[in-house]
Amino acid sequence: MSDIEKLRIEMEKITADMLRLLKSRTDIAKEIGDLKSKQGRVVSDETREDELRNKMMKACDEIGFDKTLAARFLNFLLNESVKVQ
């Protein structure tokens, strides 16, 4: 097996892990949506979203990760959370 094939297998495993985590995150977002509905709260919470963005940008600094890519990914996650809520 070539080095490229080994790396591709590793990437595939990581991608599968990410999908499992995305499903877990989506399930939790649905639960949050149900609770918000029962409490008469609006779905979107700008304060919480800003708090999460700030925490994730700090995490990017700590691990040396591209903030632009992280912000795009986080925006995707937040948009999907709002959709399922």
Q: What name fits each language-model region?
A:
Residues 1-85:
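Domain-level signature for soluble enzymes in the chorismate/prephenate branch of the shikimate pathway
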